[in-house]
Amino acid sequence: YISRLLKPLGIVCSRLAYGIPMGAATTMMVSGEPLPEYVKCFVEDCGYTSVWDQFSKELKEQFGLPKFPLMHTASWLCDRTKGWNFTEASSLEQVKKCTLPMLFIHGEKDDYVPTWMVYELYQAKPEPKELWTVPNADHATSYKLNKKEYTEKVKLFTNKYIR
């Protein structure tokens, strides 16, 4: 959309893709796809490794239910009705293909999207990449608890790649 808008005007720009929770997952999902040349880097804050991992965690923690057979059945139904299954929606697989810089941010006390997920994502992503885990931050509160430091970290990261 942005390409169609800017191209006729002759506008050249550089952009980052940035997202928090579901936006973070979306940001990582697109990171492994072919992208317009104006996308220069990514910033994700508290994104999950995959829909499978996140749904499995929620089934167990919120409802005390095992992932088998519910996850398998739900994934199969999703595939039959929507054309995709839970294993396909994987931020982890997409960041493996990402060649652009990415800043990973995650609260160290996040128990909704567990902090272990950011370490798997960070390890899977080829360089260039940076990781900042935020002490005392739970889910999606890193900015709220550390506005100045958060802004500075994002600014320092993006200034390396966007001019």
Give a label for each model feature:
Residues 108-113, 140-141:
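Acidic catalytic loop of the alpha/beta-hydrolase fold
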Residues 145-163:
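Catalytic active-site module of serine/aspartate enzymes centered on a nucleophile-bearing elbow/loop
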Residues 9-21:
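Alpha/beta-hydrolase fold nucleophile elbow
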Residues 91, 100, 114-123:
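Short alpha-helix in the alpha/beta-hydrolase fold that links the catalytic acid
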Residues 122-140, 153:
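Catalytic histidine neighborhood in serine/cysteine hydrolases
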Residues 97-99, 104-106, 110:
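Short beta-strand/loop motif that positions the catalytic acidic residue
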Residues 29-84:
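Hydrolase active-site cap/lid region
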Residues 1-9:
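Alpha/beta-hydrolase active-site loop
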